[in-house]
Swiss-Prot record:
Name under which the protein is recorded: Putative F-box protein At3g18330
Regions crossing the membrane: none
Domain F-box positions: 1-46
Domain of life: Eukaryota
Gene3D superfamilies, sorted: 1.20.1280.50
Pfam families: F-box, FBA_1
Amino acid sequence: MPMPNLPKELVEEILSFVPATYLKRLSATCKPWNRLIHNDKRFARKHYDNAAKEFLVFMMRKNFRIIRRGVNLHGADPSAEVKGELTLPDPYFKNSADEFHIDRVFHCDGLLLCTSKLERRMVVWNPLTGETKWIQTHEEGDNFFLGYSQEDKNISCKKSYKIMGFYRSGSKVWEYDFNSDSWRVLNGILPNWYFDKSYKCVSLKGNTYMLAGAVTDMGFDLSLQSYDFSTEKFAPVSLPVPSQARSLNGANRLSVVRGEKLALLYRRDKRSKAEIWVTNKIDDTTEGAVSWTKVLELDLSRELHALFTSNFLVDEEKKVFICCVSWKEDEDENKSNKVYIVGEDNIVKEIDSGEDATSGCEPTILSLYVPSLVYM
């Protein structure tokens, strides 16, 4: 049966709602669709805005590859199924089998910023399309964050991707612009706060949000800072918990809920329950007016307290907490990565990933990864 001759605009509108992984397969069915899916940046942005989103858990393998898992929270028995392995060939080596040693991954807009502690270079990678952009840095390090500036917030396709970062050796903020393919220094904008590793940072609507701390006469203050790639400025964001904390290294983590809200994992000390707080929907009209709601309170046994020091996901509607932790059993020589799912009843479901933990790497959860057709 021949395909109906639908108007081009209607076909584009329908395709923009098809999940990216299925759309990529459809591109081989006809040349117009192939051009639309692979060569049209405007459609890529429209598709990212419209397409259905999915939870994907990313974990580091021992060989520095990434495996991805789909998390299914429907039914009485939640699961985390392996969806496949991602490989990133390193063009620096002649042998195509050699791969870039990824230590940390930062996610924005369907793109992955992959960094290595031992390299003066990084790569931005779209795992779905295979597009990569390799970028030289001035020093080794992994405190880099991907985002975008946008002059007209109403035009989705007018996004300029950028990378912001700072080195441990100094207080300067560096910013890389994809359009100019160059780095520049932003002087005098870094707040007088201590910023921890990038797993305490997330991207939401193109901005980077990060937990920070400062030593005061009263002890240690906890702060949430946002970096706006359009204004190139940091700004404080209100927190729902007391600012005083024991340290920044405790059970304080950030995540993103369905690409619209921030989530905070907070535990004041080892004797306290862990609290999961979620903001209102953050968009261009929020203008710093952020409100928080506590959606979960977890009281787990002492041997499971390590769950509170990992990256996490939270399903606000189902009131479920998800994290990845590296465990070492008494009889084992190696650590293994495990996925944990905890409900509001504090019942813990443990899923063994079947993977040994990578030395020097934390098992990574991307807050909400959405496979996309986005171009850099």
